[in-house]
UniProtKB/Swiss-Prot annotation:
Belongs to the ATPase alpha/beta chains family. Has multiple subunits with at least A(3), B(3), C, D, E, F, H, I and proteolipid K(x). It comes from the Archaea. This is A-type ATP synthase subunit A 3. The lineage of its organism: Archaea, Methanobacteriati, Methanobacteriota, Stenosarchaea group, Methanomicrobia. One of its GO terms (cellular component) is plasma membrane. It is found in: Cell membrane. Component of the A-type ATP synthase that produces ATP from ADP in the presence of a proton gradient across the membrane. The A chain is the catalytic subunit.
């Protein structure tokens, strides 16, 4: 360790070639140059290694040393991850700020986890207990929202020879001595894990319930299952980042991992400013108390975008192994793909479509396939899940480009953001005609069992109304709305109510930003009860223009923004006004 192992012979952007690297392994982490830049071996030919460097390589020259670490690129896992902001290679940015100032100096490093902070350790096992990989042997309170379970690392089993008593310890203290039969192994609260290797599980399970987000169009029409995968493609300005941040704020997961991969720094600044002030609707604590942020902004080295994605999913797997439900947001996977394209070009590989490497689809699949609901290792019947939501930024909003198309082959939910809806100030700008979810049957059953009957019928009817409205728009453009029969005019009124009072949601309103499932069902029930009464009124000769002027239409628009105290009076008022429609024929 620490000896000079190789010498740089060529530098091209983030890619470095070195010789004298005989005995090295693929994906081994190395220190490059006099400044000790962090790199990873990606090609080996004889004693020559091609290294992907995760820091700025300006000033690096042939002849400088390359030092092996004899370890794969890994992350540190243990108490202290929650509430911390890292860069793509798990350097804590607040520590780097204290050490080097606003700009990260080349070769800067700091321990990923605080070695000085003490945590109160609660043992969950005793001396003499037989334990195996994945078993919980202790617990520390990592934040007000998260109990951090100390687990037997994968690949180890044996008898506990010693376990620390309840008390205050730093994460490097020995808390367990495990007799494996071959040796007595000291365990601390820290584990290291290679970022490219998925952590093992006992069994992969099918999703059985939706991951509720509080966003009406998602929960009702295009639900994501707990342990599922989703993509949010959209052109610039269509609201990808706001949707991602909304999901990070309100999704009903235990842990949130937010990866800012190649996006603008001010978006991460927004997250840093907002999240500590926001309250988790489930616990009442700050949202930052259950969140890990990984910031690899557009002005940071290109190669580190890949590392940031793998770092994030590895941390997510670690918390999943504790039995938590984790939601991971990657904004944006397109920037990661662009980094792959640049490095592939530097390596002079044969390009695929639009210059992306031929292995683009397999790399994306490797990432998304680490999501899922799983049965965990260890004694007992524990399960956890990772739900992955990846933003895609197709140039010009072209969904036929390779990153979007390869992502769509993998994920089960597609939320297509539409620039036209965004320009109309309809947010979330998810196009209901282009989007889809393969988890709808699972979610529909859950809604009917836990929230209320008729949900599936109302959802299907909503989609039929919106699709029929789209067909009628062609006719309206040609001949105008005056020529339509009253039944079609009523359908247009229904679609308008659904679009403006239900699907449209204001992210910056205190109450409209999040709508729970019971309120969503209540809103749908009120709207469809009105639709039934309106159809009967139409049969008795009442015009759609008369229905359009009723006060209940305005009340629908206030449902989303109503506070909990205002909800009951508002819905009672809507019910009275809806019932009064049957008396309209007497006024004619």
């Amino acid at each position: 360790m620490g000896e000079k192992n190789g010498v740089i012979i060529r530098v091209t952007g983030p890619v470095v070639e070195a010789e004298g690297m005989a005995g090295s392994r693929m994906y081994e982490s190395v220190r490059v140059g006099n400044d000790g830049l962090i790199g990873e071996i990606i090609i080996l030919e004889g004693d020559r290694a091609t290294i992907q460097v995760y820091e700025e390589t300006i000033g690096l020259t042939p002849g400088e040393p390359v030092v092996r670490t004899y370890l794969p690129l890994s992350v540190e896992l243990g108490p202290g991850l929650i509430g911390t902001m890292y860069d793509g290679i798990q350097r804590p940015l607040e520590e780097i700020l204290k050490n080097t100032g606003d700009m990260i100096e080349r070769g800067s490093s700091a321990p990923a986890l605080d070695r000085t902070k003490k945590y109160r350790f609660y043992p969950l096992a005793k001396s003499g207990d037989m334990v195996r990989e994945g078993d919980r042997i202790g617990c520390v309170r990592e934040s007000v929202s998260v109990n951090h379970y100390i687990l037997i690392p994968p690949g180890l089993s044996g008898t506990i020879h010693f376990i620390a008593e309840q008390g205050e310890y730093v994460i490097t203290d020995t808390i367990v001595i495990l007799d494996t039969g071959e040796e007595k192994k000291e365990l601390t609260m820290i584990q290291r894990w290679p970022v490219r290797d998925p952590r093992p599980v006992r069994e992969r399970l099918d999703p059985v319930e939706p991951l509720l987000t509080g966003q009406r169009i998602i929960d009702t029409l295009f639900p994501l299952a707990r342990g599922g995968t989703a993509a949010i493609p959209g052109p610039f300005g269509s609201g990808k980042t706001v949707v991602q941040q909304q999901l990070a704020k309100w999704v009903n997961a235990d842990i949130i991992i937010y990866i800012g991969c190649g996006e603008r720094g001010n978006e991460m600044a927004d997250v840093l400013e907002q999240f500590p002030t926001l309250k988790d609707p489930r616990t009442g604590h700050a949202l930052s108390s259950r969140m890990v942020l990984i910031a690899n902004t557009s002005n940071m080295p290109v190669a580190a975008r890949e590392a940031s994605v793998y770092t994030g999913i590895t941390i997510a797997e670690y918390y999943r192994d504790m039995g938590y439900h984790v939601a991971l947001m990657a904004d944006s996977t397109s920037r990661w793909a662009e980094a792959m394209r640049e490095i592939s070009g530097r390596l002079e590989e044969m390009p695929g479509e639009e210059g992306y490497p031929a292995y683009l689809s397999s790399r994306l699949a490797d990432f998304y396939e680490r999501a899922g609901r799983v049965s965990l290792l260890g004694s007992g019947d524990h399960e956890g899940s990772i739900s992955v939501i990846g933003a895609v930024s197709p140039p010009g909003g072209d969904f036929s480009e390779p990153v979007t198309q390869n992502t769509l082959r993998i994920v089960k939910v597609f939320w297509a953001l539409d620039a036209d809806l965004a320009y109309q100030r309809h947010f979330p700008a998810i196009n209901w005609l282009m989007s889809y979810s393969l988890y709808s049957p699972i979610a529909g059953i859950w809604w009917e069992e836990h929230i209320g009957p008729e949900f599936i019928r109302m959802k299907q009817e909503m989609m039929e109304i919106l699709q029929r409205e789209n067909e009628l728009e062609e006719i309206i453009r040609l001949v105008g709305p005056e020529t339509l029969p009253e039944s079609d005019r009523l359908l247009l009124l229904k679609a308008e109510i659904l679009r403006e009072s239900y699907l449209m949601q204001y992210a910056f309103d205190e109450f409209d930003t999040f709508t729970g499932p019971k309120k969503q069902y209540r809103m749908l029930k009120a709207i469809f009860t009105f639709f039934s009464q309106a159809e009967r009124a139409l049969e008795t000769g009442i015009s759609v223009s008369r229905l359009r002027g009723l006060p209940v239409i305005e009340s629908f628009a206030r449902m989303g923004t109503a506070s909990p105290e205002e909800e009951d009076p508002l819905f009672e008022s809507i019910a009275r006004d809806t019932d009064a429609i049957r008396d309209l024929k007497e006024v004619l």
